[in-house]
Amino acid sequence: MTEHVEGTLSSGQYWQGWTGDVPVKGVVVLVHGVHEHGGRYAYVASRLVAAGYPVYAVDHPGHGRSPGTRGNIGSMAATVAGVDELARRAGSRHPGAPAFVYGHSLGGLIALQYITGTPIELRGAILSAPAVDVSAANPVQRAASGLLSRLTPNLGVLKLDPATISRDLDVVRDYRTDPLNYLGKLRARTGAEILNTVVAMQPRLEALKLPLLVFHGTADRLVPPAATEFVAEHVGSADLTVKLYDGYYHEAHNEPDRDGVLDDIVAWLDAHS
């Protein structure tokens, strides 16, 4: 049986968690992607909880049930701080349990920023389609996005198509009708924070020695699979597992064969807990 818990961080951000009645092998801090929220990972959480891994997720600033302009994360520093506070709270709820961070898309970038900084003691990290698109972080785009971020931070600059998240039409429909998702264009401030973080994080990858599982759908049109290849080539971890799912879209955990993906995640967690 899965128990749902929830609360707010010191920033006012909403967090939630899923726990179970099976022995705890480890605790997972889940970091969601842009324009969505932690509640979209209820099924992922149910699978991990059943395997002995309680899951905790925080809604980023401007996302889900957290305060802020919809779709505007404000600053990467504040977003990472929210992940850190939740990770510490989750750890205190399960003292002694190995801790893992699991980030998807923008959440993968946030997770990388966190784990290459000063995180809590971690046993490993899982990155799903991490938003590390180096080709987009060129000087011209960064300069333009920085100017827009300062002058018009809430301006919509890029439309993201929900049809590209999964081949499962029910998943796409649910995404479009979920009132907690933001369906507008990517905000200028959020875009600038993403590009700046991609650049700032790159030189820190070599020092990252944490065990990693990185996976990506080969048909992802939102974050190119080259992002996962870049991470795999530049991290310093000797314990690195990369999985590419042929023909899968952006959310491999929400594809028709999502249980196969989740089986792989559980197996990796079991091998590292």
What are these regions (language model features)?
Residues 45-68:
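Conserved alpha/beta-hydrolase
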Residues 94-104:
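Alpha/beta-hydrolase fold nucleophile elbow
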Residues 28, 33-36:
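Active-site glycine-rich loops that stabilize anionic/oxyanionic intermediates
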Residues 104-186:
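Alpha/beta-hydrolase-fold enzymes
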Residues 221-227:
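Conserved alpha/beta-hydrolase "acid-adjacent" motif
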Residues 35-38, 64-94, 261:
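Catalytic nucleophile-loop/oxyanion-hole region of alpha/beta-hydrolase
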Residues 208, 214-216, 220:
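Short beta-strand/loop motif that positions the catalytic acidic residue
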